[in-house]
């Protein structure tokens, strides 16, 4: 069920990060070298999840692995125990909660009309549902973390915190963000561009679907304009 996927990506996936934040408050702040293996594993896990996204043919699986890759950045930022890292992790968790939930909602909108989640079979929607294509574009750009979105604020703070802690981490962070942009654009082009594979008549998007996406993106845009609300 799509509702379960949306709740899982938006709320339940963030409980692990919240637990780590609480645990870090009772651990010594001067022993970050002890956490070096965990930081490396978190960043490496983010890269592997991103590479897995590039191999996915199932739309829902691609979005799910995307959520895992973002949580790798969050874990690495929390573990170094700096104010910038903590602020960036909180910003990215909140922003990604809205973004991933909106992506799952759009995936369900596509599935209800095509009855498949295979990327190559869902193409050509820009001719049939142009408004849905607009929602896909905006949400994918948020997932890539373009400025001035909250996703960009979170990733910038995380990148700055990790670079100040160890400049070498910029290599893994840069690679992760490059692959994120690649699979996000691949997902958009695969589901929206090209000739349509549908032979039957497709019904337009309902008002409730537009409202649901707007209720995801409106708070995200508001927080992006005023980040002091959450960090």
Curated annotation (Swiss-Prot):
It holds the Pfam family Proton_antipo_M. GO terms for molecular function: NADH dehydrogenase (ubiquinone) activity; ubiquinone binding. It is a multi-pass membrane protein. It is found in: Mitochondrion membrane. Keywords: Electron transport, Membrane, Mitochondrion, NAD, Respiratory chain, Translocase, Transmembrane, Transmembrane helix, Transport, Ubiquinone. One of its GO terms (cellular component) is mitochondrial membrane. It comes from the Eukaryota. It catalyses: a ubiquinone + NADH + 5 H(+)(in) = a ubiquinol + NAD(+) + 4 H(+)(out). The keyword Transmembrane applies. PANTHER family: NADH-UBIQUINONE OXIDOREDUCTASE CHAIN 4 (PTHR43507:SF20). This is NADH-ubiquinone oxidoreductase chain 4. The gene is MT-ND4.
């Amino acid at each position: 069920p799509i509702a379960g996927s949306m709740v899982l990506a938006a709320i339940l996936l963030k409980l692990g990060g919240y637990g780590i934040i609480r645990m870090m408050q009772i651990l010594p702040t001067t022993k970050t070298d002890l956490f070096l293996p965990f930081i490396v594993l978190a960043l490496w896990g983010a890269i592997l999840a991103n590479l897995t996204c590039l191999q996915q043919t199932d739309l829902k699986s691609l979005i799910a692995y995307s959520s895992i890759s973002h949580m790798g950045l969050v874990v690495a930022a929390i573990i170094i125990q700096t104010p910038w890292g903590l602020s960036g992790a909180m910003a990215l968790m909140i922003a990604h909660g809205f973004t991933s939930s909106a992506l799952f909602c759009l995936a369900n909108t596509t599935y209800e009309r095509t009855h498949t989640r295979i990327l190559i079979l869902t193409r050509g929607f820009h001719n049939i549902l142009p408004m849905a294509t607009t929602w896909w574009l905006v949400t994918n750009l948020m997932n890539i973390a373009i400025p001035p979105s909250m996703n960009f604020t979170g990733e910038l703070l995380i990148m700055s915190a990790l670079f100040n802690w160890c400049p070498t981490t910029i290599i893994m962070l840069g690679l992760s963000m490059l692959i994120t942009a690649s699979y996000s654009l691949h997902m958009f082009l695969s589901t929206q561009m090209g000739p349509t594979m549908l032979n039957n008549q497709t019904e337009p998007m309902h008002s409730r679907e537009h409202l649901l996406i707007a209720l995801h993106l409106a708070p995200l845009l508001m927080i992006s304009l005023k980040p002091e609300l959450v960090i």
